[in-house]
Amino acid sequence: YKMTIRLREQQQTLTREKAHLADSIADISHQIRTPLTSINLLIGLLSEPKLTDARRQQLIHALYELLSRIDWLITTLLKISRLDAGTVQFKQEQVSLEELLKKSCVTLLIPMELRGQELLIHADGAFRGDLPWTCEAIGNIVKNCMEHTPEGGRIEIDAAENALYSEIIIKDNGTGISPEDLPHIFERFYKGKDSDGKSFGIGLALSRMIIAGQGGTVKAENRKPVGAMFTIRFYKGTV
């Protein structure tokens, strides 16, 4: 009897996993098809004989941007698949929190400057973990804050270490997160109601997987009067 129950539970688990896989494949196909459709349209426009040089350069720039988005999508999906498969071995090395935050944000400095946004980093102490993977996790969260903060806004990151954990708090003075989106923002392929057409809904999901894979936690909440706040903790022992 117990064997029958166990087999039934395994069958139900397999059925759920197959359904999840089918949904994921459908989501991935849709995510890739959207920019590919735009690329096809751009190629058609580039073939017009009366195209001015200025217009051609504009279309080529848009084409490169779309190709970069597809490249980022595929790279991120491959990282997620590696984490899903359990093939990632996170390093355990002592890393300065200041070094971690600066490296996490380095690719975002120019986009922030173009938006007139201010980035403030206050960090003290260290954490034990994998520097490259954790940079990826934090960079995705900061990028999300940047995209939801108006021009001239501010993003502030505070990091400190205590006897129990190393904590990183990322705050912005942007639009915040709608109450209905808040419980779902770390879910794979979830797009909030205020997300633009460029969002794939996987950056924050990847961040959570990387942080959780190192025994850490991440939560999001709204600030008063405006803005969002992400709190990351890497624990020094089992919690």
Predicted regions and their residues:
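Acidic ATP/Mg2+-coordinating residue in the GHKL
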Residues: 172
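Conserved glycine-rich
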Residues: 216-217
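Short beta-strand/loop element within the Bergerat-fold HATPase_c
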Residues: 152-164
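Short conserved segment of the HATPase_c
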Residues: 177-190
